[in-house]
Amino acid sequence: QASQTGKCGDNITWTLDDKGNLELTGTGKMYDYTLMGAPWGGTIESVTISEGIENIGKYAFSFCGKLTKVVIPNSVKEILEGVFRGCEGLETVTIGESVASIGPSAFSGCRGLLSVTIPSAVKVIEAMAFFNCGKLKSLSVDKENKVYDSRGNCNAIIETATNTLIYGCKNTVIPNTVTKIGEDAFAYCVALTSIEIPNSVTDINSGAFIACI
């Protein structure tokens, strides 16, 4: 079967070979898609995103269950809504140094994801970005980040200004400077067996520990 090709941005071309390897080349912004609506479908096994691409369009790789790892280049500034939603086989993702925003449900349902490092440029992590990622073992934030932190290597993402823990994982140790646990912070964290909530926490938002079974 010959490789398939098309456009996925005004100046971006996609090519899919017969082994399921997708390559995106070009510059500028990607098109947005509906859930599972991207032209390459859900059967891709790898994706290579070239330097020069500035964002990853909505739902671009949603429910691509065979993807196991992704490297997002340093030219990318935005990961939009639902980009990797439902990619259950995704284990590792490298988020490029220029990414400033991670959209809603961007990695929601990535049940195989093991670790996430938030780079220094990230200013916005939207709701449910890492919802239902039950296998996460490691969550860290670059020490130069001005908005989020993972103080004391706590294995969590904390909104610095409000001392709100927004995402945790099975290895999280909640620091005694955290005052609030955000909505869905540990939702579907099925590997979680126990957690100590320090006295500093005065507010636990709805759904913080939903479906931790």
PLM feature segments, named:
Residues Q1-S3, I210-I213:
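Short intrinsically disordered, low-complexity coil segments enriched in acidic
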Residues A2-M36:
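Extracellular, modular beta-sheet/disulfide-rich ectodomains of secreted and cell-surface proteins
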Residues A2-T5, G86, G112:
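Positively charged, low-complexity intrinsically disordered regions
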Residues D17-G28, G42-N55, G65-E78, E88-S101, ...:
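Structural signature of tandem-repeat unit edges
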Residues G57-A60, L80-R85, G103-A106, A127-A129, ...:
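Consensus positions within tandem repeat domains that build extended binding/scaffold surfaces
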